[in-house]
Regions:
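Acidic-leaning, charged glycine-interspersed low-complexity segments
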Residues: 18-23, 30, 42-48, 91-147
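Active-site-adjacent structural patch at catalytic or cofactor/ligand-binding sites
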Residues: 52-53, 57-82
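Short C-terminal domain-edge/linker segments immediately following a structured domain
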Residues: 77-84, 101-107
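Short, charged, solvent-exposed linker or helix-capping segments at domain edges/interfaces
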Residues: 83-86, 148-152
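Short histidine-centered catalytic/ligand-binding loop motif
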Residues: 82-94
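Small/polar-rich, solvent-exposed N-terminal microdomains that initiate assembly or binding
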Residues: 1-62, 115, 150-152
Length: 152
């Protein structure tokens, strides 16, 4: 699983590194920031990666396949006035284009240790207090893991 996380970070950095300020594991930084905490500082735009669930099936005594969910959150601090006629309307479109570009570098990619390519399953947009806009995409893949049992 750690290889998948590292590979995701590297792929995003390779394809989009110059446009992002931070690529990190999602540890609730945005929710903490929205709650007034600065314990997990973030800079924007950022991508936060989570692997919230894997459902495992046994293939052999020490080999399992897992159906894995990956969440990728692209976040911006939005201080632009993007209402129609503001002359800054393009900023909203630029954020959406960056989200599409992020999906383009992940969807269909086969990462090391994965039995299937990463496939986009769902996406949504939402805002948090403080002018934070989040473009969240959920992906699915299948990973293989060999269990290393320690014998006594």
């Amino acid at each position: 699983m750690e290889q998948l996380f590292n590979d995701l970070q590297q792929q995003i950095a390779k394809e989009m590194g110059s446009t992002l300020s931070l690529i990190d594991e999602d540890c609730g930084q945005l929710e903490a920031l929205a709650g007034g905490e600065d314990r997990y500082p973030v800079t924007f735009p950022c991508v936060l990666i989570g692997i919230p669930e894997t459902l495992w099936d046994n293939l052999a005594s020490n080999l399992q396949h897992g159906k894995t969910t990956v969440t990728v959150r692209l976040a911006f601090d939005c201080y632009d006035d993007t209402h129609y006629g503001s002359t800054q309307e393009q900023h909203a479109a630029e954020r959406m284009a960056l989200s599409r570009r992020l999906n383009g570098c992940l969807h269909g990619w086969r990462f090391e240790g994965c039995a299937t390519v990463l496939v986009r399953r769902a996406s949504r947009q939402f805002s948090l207090p403080g002018g934070i806009k989040i473009y969240e995409t959920e992906y699915a893949t299948t990973v293989a893991e060999e269990i290393q049992n320690s014998e006594s």
